[in-house]
């Protein structure tokens, strides 16, 4: 496909684009996973983009709290260090998986590759966590 894609949600969620804004500029929903929609603005007739099979799972095998992240946001490395230190101090098992290649992004277990929280194998949120927010999610 020659064009542009974006991720939106059927319900307003943090860090997700506004669907009505993109519809106004001609974007169309081309795929859906749960509440998340892939919108595309095609510049030519070609193959329609879609979410990868791995993203459709929205779950992982690990039962530990696991965060998939990339450096798309300038605060990510700071939060990774803060959470890592916090988990170590509290004796909490916390895994980080950095998405640092195109292959890893294409094979991520959910629609987010900038920050995705999984707990007990299930996708929890895409909110970048600090120590306080992390502690609340564990309760």
Q: What kind of feature is each model-predicted range?
A:
Residues 109-118:
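Structural micro-motif
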Residues 1-15:
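Conserved GNAT acetyl-CoA-binding A-motif
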Residues 34-57:
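C-terminal "cap" of GNAT-fold acetyltransferases
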Residues 91-104:
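Thiol-based oxidoreductase modules, predominantly thioredoxin-like and allied folds used
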Residues 8, 19, 23-40, 124:
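Conserved catalytic-core motifs of GNAT/GCN5-like acyltransferases
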Residues 54-89:
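Local sequence-structure signature of Cys/Sec-based thiol-disulfide redox active-site neighborhoods
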Residues 119-139:
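Non-catalytic, surface beta->alpha helical segment in thiol-disulfide oxidoreductase systems
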Residues 1-4, 25-31, 87-94:
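Structural alpha-beta junctions
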């Amino acid at each position: 496909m020659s064009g542009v894609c974006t991720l939106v949600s059927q319900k307003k969620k943090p860090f997700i684009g506004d669907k009505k804004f993109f519809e106004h500029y001609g974007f169309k929903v081309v795929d859906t996973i749960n509440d998340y929609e892939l919108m595309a603005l095609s510049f030519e007739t070609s193959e329609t983009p879609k979410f990868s099979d791995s993203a459709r799972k929205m779950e992982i095998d690990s039962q530990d709290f696991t965060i998939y992240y990339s450096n798309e946001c300038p605060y990510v490395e700071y939060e990774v260090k803060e959470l890592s230190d916090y988990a170590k101090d509290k004796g909490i098992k916390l895994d980080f998986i950095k998405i640092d290649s195109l292959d890893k992004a294409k094979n991520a277990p959910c629609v987010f590759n900038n920050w995705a929280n999984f707990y007990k194998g299930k996708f929890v949120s895409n909110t970048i966590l600090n120590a306080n927010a992390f502690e609340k999610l564990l309760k």
